Design a protein with these regions (language model features):
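Expand to "…catalyze enediolate/carbanion chemistry for C-C bond making/breaking, isomerization
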Residues: 1-302
Length: 302
């Protein structure tokens, strides 16, 4: 199974929409999330639960990491888990996590269903979804509430509503929240999955993803399968970036051999932090190439 740190695109798919669930496997998204909460009306949740095992089998065959987002545990969440765990999802996401106890409760319930379904105890990862201000300011504690947590995901619409923010394509209203969330996830040692871009705008999602990557994000959630190839491309070091990283490393190491503390490359001073970042970029490019050998769909269409 691909580790969370190498998963760039996390696609939410309506849980009872059979056509969307089938098509998702061809989207190229690294993680496919059957969404049983907001994307699935209560009257259709039983149908979504019934579909889960077959959908997960098809998604695995397509090379994706399989995830599901159920409902809060004090709502329909337990019924969701009882059904979907039969399909052994790789990741269980929990919406509206506002405190560490929500994660601990999910951990206990997932362990119970792992035992009941013959799944290796502890093998199912958890993905807390941060959707309220109260959860955002406790992200470190939430991320560390269970060893199953490898990543946390930031919401956009519910968080904006909780803040009373006015939504816009430029995302300015959530800029601080996205930066704060990233810092908390890095401090906790987990992957930060950025909020989705919720407009049907290819140029917009590319700008938004590249801005997120500049901050330090390496993963982004999405609600439109057409965005998967764009996000994957933006979150993957390009050939030009790899070439520049190699030049930077060579320039810095040559300067060190001459006894100089820094180098200059393209008019910019290169010191130890930049050298380390370049090494990390090369390592990530190699890991991504190994983890995702399948070709990406054409982001510009057929």
């Amino acid at each position: 199974m691909i580790p969370s740190r190498l998963c760039r695109s996390w696609l939410f798919v309506p849980g009872a929409d059979e056509a969307a669930l089938t098509a998702a496997g061809a989207s190229g998204a690294d993680v496919l999330i059957q969404e049983l909460e907001d994307f699935t009306p209560p009257a259709r949740r039983a149908q979504a639960r019934m579909l889960a095992p077959g959908v997960y089998q098809a998604w695995r065959a397509a090379g994706a990491v399989v995830a599901v987002r159920g409902n809060p545990l004090d709502g329909d969440g337990i019924d969701d888990l009882a059904a979907v765990m039969r399909g052994a999802p790789d990741i269980v996401a929990l919406p509206k996590v506002a405190e560490p106890d929500h994660v601990r409760w999910l951990d206990r319930e997932v362990a119970r269903f792992e035992r009941d379904c013959g799944i290796a105890i502890g093998s199912t990862r958890l993905l807390p979804n941060i959707e309220f201000a109260r959860g955002l300011v406790q992200t470190v504690a939430i991320a560390q509430a269970s060893p199953r947590v490898e990543a946390c995901l930031l919401a956009s619409e519910d968080l904006a509503a909780d803040l009373g923010a006015e939504r816009g394509r430029d995302g300015l209203e959530l800029a601080y929240a996205r930066q704060r969330f990233l810092v908390e996830c890095v401090a906790a040692g987990v992957v930060a999955v950025d909020a989705p871009y919720t407009w049907r705008d290819a140029d917009g999602v590319e700008r938004d993803t590249r801005w997120a990557r500049r901050l330090g994000y390496r993963a982004k959630s999405l609600v439109d399968p057409a965005h998967a190839a764009i996000v994957n491309r933006a979150m993957t070091p390009s050939a030009d970036e790899v070439a520049r990283a190699r030049r930077l490393i060579a320039a810095f190491e040559s300067a060190r051999e001459r006894g100089e503390p820094r180098a200059e490359l393209d008019g910019s001073l290169v010191e130890v932090p930049a050298w380390r970042n370049a090494q990390r970029l090369l390592a990530r490019a190699a890991e991504l190439a190994d983890a995702h050998p399948r070709p990406l769909p054409n982001a510009d269409g057929p």
